[in-house]
Amino acid sequence: MFKIMNAHSLEMRKELGAYYTPSALSQVMSDWAIRRPTDKILEPSFGGCGFLESCEKSLMEIGCINPMENLFGVDVDQKAFDTLKKKYGHLLIKKHFILSDFINVFPKDFGIEDFEVIIGNPPYISMHNMSYEQRKSCEKVFADSPFKTKTLGRNASLWGFFLLHALSFIRENGRIAWVLPSSFLNAYYAK
């Protein structure tokens, strides 16, 4: 599994901001976030599918008969989709998974209004390492968000914009479980 999850070179993983989460941690997070067998769950940067696997297990443990009906995901990387197909093959529901930058996706793209759970490990790319298109998309997320703060701006990392954008996907009383960097605790834009 490690080879599948790390299908990219170290250089490419850094470019994508991809850092994979240990399965024990993703399982603890899934078990905390998922409360009902009917919860709709979004993983906005599913990469090696670790969180999808943990969510599938959590759903089955609480009585969900077909967990793939509840799982949705986005990833910008075709290799993530290759991994998804290898792991889930015929169980995949195509409209549940979108090949795109999460910043450019909206709940309506999945055909539903919102999610009970958003879970994952967002990409860690500093603003100055983002492409022009990514920066423009992030600026639009910031401008359109009812949750924006005055501090999120030019110094923010992509994970900050992912979090801000994810808030428009979450159902009232839903849960967001994300692996965030320690800068979340002290970055000015994270306040």
Residue ranges: model-predicted function:
Residues 1-63, 69-87, 91-92, 106, ...:
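Class I S-adenosyl-L-methionine
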Residues 7-12, 16-17, 49-53, 57-65, ...:
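SAM-dependent methyltransferase catalytic-core segment centered on the flexible catalytic loop
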Residues 37-39, 68-69, 94, 112-115, ...:
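A general structural motif
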Residues 71-73, 96, 118:
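Generic beta-strand hydrophobic packing signal
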Residues 92-102:
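Conserved SAM-binding strand-loop segment of SAM-dependent methyltransferases
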